């Protein structure tokens, strides 16, 4: 499993539908980048100048919304993930 460092979070990107309700298939390069996913791993938090860790607001299994162009896409064991800084997460879906 991927283990993020510092204030980074690993998100399993939700697979968006590739076909519209009317049956039209959308080319992968025409689809917008998804902005929601499930948190699968969380780093220990950023380190302050005095050596204290700042805990993150998200935890594993949280459904989140993140900035459209945030993070780095990573493929690991055939699954697509996004590794981003916690500050790029906009909201937790409850």
UniProtKB/Swiss-Prot annotation:
PANTHER family: 10 KDA HEAT SHOCK PROTEIN, CO-CHAPERONIN GROES. SUPFAM superfamilies: GroES-like. Together with the chaperonin GroEL, plays an essential role in assisting protein folding. The GroEL-GroES system forms a nano-cage that allows encapsulation of the non-native substrate proteins and provides a physical environment optimized to promote and accelerate protein folding. GroES binds to the apical surface of the GroEL ring, thereby capping the opening of the GroEL channel. Belongs to the GroES chaperonin family. The lineage of its organism: Bacteria, Bacillati, Bacillota, Bacilli, Lactobacillales. InterPro entries: Chaperonin_GroES, Chaperonin_GroES_sf, GroES-like_sf. It is found in: Cytoplasm. This is Co-chaperonin GroES. One of its GO terms (molecular function) is ATP binding. Heptamer of 7 subunits arranged in a ring. Interacts with the chaperonin GroEL. The keyword Chaperone applies. One of its GO terms (cellular component) is cytoplasm. Keywords: Chaperone, Cytoplasm. NCBIfam families: PRK00364.2-2, PRK00364.2-4, PRK00364.2-5. GO terms for biological process: chaperone cofactor-dependent protein refolding. The keyword Chaperone applies. SMART domains: Cpn10 (SM00883).
